[in-house]
Amino acid sequence: MADLQKIVDDLSSLTVLEAAELAKLLEEKWGVSAAAAVAVAAAPGAAAGGAPAEEKTEFQVVLAAAGDKKIEVIKEVRAITGLGLKEAKDLVEGAPKPLKEGVAKDEAEKIKAALEKAGAKVELK
């Protein structure tokens, strides 16, 4: 039992970067992926629910890619978010990035349509 407590104490003292490195090393050693484990753990609860899923009311608008017409996309991002030119340009060039969060479905669809018309690739999550 003392060995387990020492392991807990050692793990608790790790920095975030050290913990991430440890996770990566364990994934390589054991031949697993932490993302796959989360997906597998979430799947049984979703499948066993049986009740109809509630319709999502809030969406996140994610700029997936700027496309060929970057200037038009930057203009549209500025109009939607109210960001300055530099901030909008950085957001567009850093895609994929969330553009707006907690948006109603109809507003999210309007934003998506406007950005796609400007040449961007957009995802609603």
From Swiss-Prot:
InterPro entries tied to this protein: Ribosomal_bL12 (IPR000206), Ribosomal_bL12_C (IPR013823), Ribosomal_bL12_C/ClpS-like (IPR014719), Ribosomal_bL12_oligo (IPR008932), Ribosomal_bL12_oligo_N_sf (IPR036235)
Domain of life the protein comes from: Bacteria
GO-annotated biological processes: translation
GO cellular component: cytosolic large ribosomal subunit
A GO MF term: mRNA binding
Coiled coil, from the record: none
Keywords: Ribonucleoprotein, Ribosomal protein
Presence of the UniProt keyword Ribosomal protein in the record: yes
Stretch forming the signal peptide: none
KW Ribosomal protein (keyword) present: yes
Function: Forms part of the ribosomal stalk which helps the ribosome interact with GTP-bound translation factors. Is thus essential for accurate translation.
Subunit structure: Homodimer. Part of the ribosomal stalk of the 50S ribosomal subunit. Forms a multimeric L10(L12)X complex, where L10 forms an elongated spine to which 2 to 4 L12 dimers bind in a sequential fashion. Binds GTP-bound translation factors.
Family to which the UniProt record says this protein belongs: Belongs to the bacterial ribosomal protein bL12 family.
Cited HAMAP family: Ribosomal_bL12 (MF_00368)
Name of the protein in its database record: Large ribosomal subunit protein bL12
Organism for this UniProt entry: Afipia carboxidovorans (strain ATCC 49405 / DSM 1227 / KCTC 32145 / OM5)
